[in-house]
Amino acid sequence: MKALVKTFAAAALITVSTFAMAAEGPGAKATKANVNLSTADLALDHYVAVTTEGESAGVDQLFAEDFNQKIQSSNAQSYNRSEVVKSFKKQKGEKMNCTVSTDIIEESAEYMVAKVTLKFENFTKTDLVTLERLGKNWKVSKSINSYK
């Protein structure tokens, strides 16, 4: 009788743990993964991956708390950190059909300003990105977008 109780308890434990793992889904841990942002170049590369390749891992740690994004157009818009992070998380896995080029405009031990150009078939998006060293990691603190 004790063996039967132990068998049912083991089966119940296996069933519960299987359902718990299935509820998380295969990509649940990937979005919470830490990314290496120890250099400005790594942070810039990750920013480009997030904006153009739908990379969602490490999005929360990529942007500074006071991050601000401005979009220059006839109807200028501004977005804060939480709005941008939420938007990028929704775009998980979506790849942009564009050619990407990056140019470092200015760089020091504490900050970097880069120009990221996305050339699409009918228009070009230019993104001026400011990155800052905050502690041991680099974070994106500002982004200004324009379209041609």
Model regions and ranges:
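Short beta-strand edge/turn micro-motifs at domain boundaries
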Residues: 25, 124-148
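Bacterial N-terminal signal peptides that target proteins for export
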Residues: 1-9
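A mature extracytoplasmic/lumenal domain signature
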Residues: 63, 73, 117-120, 129-133, ...
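Surface-exposed, charged secondary-structure patches
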Residues: 32, 82-123
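Short, low-complexity N-terminal intrinsically disordered segments enriched in polar/charged residues
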Residues: 4, 20-53
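Short, well-ordered alpha-helical segments enriched in acidic and aromatic residues
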Residues: 54-70
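N-terminal signal peptide c-region/cleavage motif recognized by signal peptidases
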Residues: 15-18
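A short gly/proline-enriched turn/hairpin at secondary-structure junctions
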Residues: 68-77, 93
